[in-house]
Amino acid sequence: MAGTNGGGAFLLVYIFFTIAIGLPVMLAEFSLGRRSQQNALGTFRVLAPGTKWFLFGLLSIIAAALILSFYGTVSGWTLEYVWLSISNSFQGQSAEDSIFTNFISHPYKALLWHIGFMFLTGAIIMGGVQKGIERYSKLMMPLLFIIIIALSINSMTLSGSAEGLRFLFFPKLSELTADSILSALGQAFFSLSVGMGILLTYASYIPKNDNLTGISLKVIITDTLVAILAGIAILPAVFSFHIDPQAGPGLVFLTLPKVFQGLPAGEIWAILFFILLTFAALTSAISLLEVPVAYLVEEKKLKRPWATVIATLVITCIGSFNTLSFGPLRHVQIFGMSLFDACDYLCSNILLPLGGILICIFAGWYLDKSILYSEISNNGSLKTRFFRLAPICIFLILLNVLGII
C-alpha cells in the first residue's frame, strides 16, 4: 500500500489514523464486545434491545465474510509461491516472466489453492478460540516477527537500500490525494480489524479484569511496528534492484522472486518470506472466519463444527468467483471493475469506514456512558469526546473522496 500511495506520506497518514481514529474505535469495540459477551450481532441485540442497531451487527458479519472471500484468494497465491520457492522454480526467471499471470489466469490452479487455504483456516478454527486460534497464533506470530526482522536486516545491507529507506521514511506530502488518504484510513481499519465485527467477537472472550486500554495500545504498537518492518524488508530491496515501487500486488508476486535471486542464499530468503506471508494471511483469515462462525453458534445454536463447515463453504464459494475473475471470469465487470476489485473496493472503501462511523456513533451518542467507563479499565481517563470526534473525521474523509466537499 505504501508503494502505490506515496511511500512515507502514506505511512505518516496511516500512523495518524491508527492512533487518532483506530484507537478509539478499537476501544469502543472491545468495550461493547466484552460488556455484551456476544457475537457481532448479539452485541447490539443485548445492548440496544428493541432497536434496529442489530442490523449493524449483521452488516459487520457480512463485511467479514466478503473480506475473507477475496482475502482467501490472495492467501491461496501465497501457498502457491511457498511451493514455487521450495521447488526453486524461480531460478533463471526475470521480472518480466509471466509465472504469476499464468498462475492466476489458470482455469483451476489458483482456485485449488484458494479452496485449500480456506479449508485449512476452517480446520484450525473448528477447535475454538483457545484450542484452535490461540494455540496456532502463539506459534505463528513470534515466528512471523523473527522472520520479518531477519528480512529487514538483510534488506538494509543491499546496495542502494538507502533510496528505499528514504522513500519510506521521508514523506512527500504533495503526493497525497483524497484516494490515498481514504486508502490509508481503510488500511488502518483493515490492519487493526476494526469495523468488521472481529473485535466485538473476540472481546467477548476477554476476562473482565484485563485492561482494555493496555490491550488496545499493545495491538496498535505491534501492528505499526510490523507494518514498518515490512516496509523496511521490501522497499530497500525493491529500490536496490530498480523495481517500480508502485507495482502493487505485482511487487510481491511478480518482482520479489527476482529480488531473492540476487540475494545470498536467495532460495532460503524466498521460502522464509512467502511462509511469512502465509502465516500473516492465516492469522487474519482465522479472525475473519470466527465472526460468522460465532454468529451461527450463538444466534442459530449450531454446533461449532457444523457452523465452521457452513461458514467456510459459503465464503469459499463466494471467493471462488473472485479467484476466477483473473481467469475464466475476467470479462465479468461491475461498474468497470473485476469481481475481485469490486469486492475489495466495497469492503475497504465503504463497509469498513461505514462500520467505524456506526460503532463510534453507537458508543459515543447512543450507549449509556457508564457502560463504557465501567469497561475501559483506566479509571475513566478516556473521555467520550474521542468517540464523538472519530466518526466526524471518517465522515468528512468519505465526503471529500466522493467529491461532495
Positions of PLM-derived features:
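Inter-helical loop and helix-membrane interface segments of multi-pass membrane transporters/permeases
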Residues: 2-5, 40-59, 72-130, 162-182, ...
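Extracellular loop-to-transmembrane helix junctions
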Residues: 3-28, 109-110, 348, 352-355
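Select transmembrane alpha-helical segments in multipass membrane proteins
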Residues: 9-13, 51-65, 112-117, 176-185, ...
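Juxtamembrane transmembrane-helix boundary signature
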Residues: 13-48, 237, 241-244, 361-365
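Helix-loop-helix connectors at the membrane interface of multi-pass transporters/channels
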Residues: 42, 75-105, 206-209, 214, ...
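C-terminal membrane-solvent junction of multi-pass transporters and transport-like membrane proteins
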Residues: 56-59, 302-312, 344-394
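Loop-to-transmembrane helix boundary motifs in multi-pass membrane proteins
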Residues: 110-112, 222-228, 267-270, 279-282, ...
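Membrane-embedded translocation segments of transport machinery
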Residues: 134, 138-282, 306-307
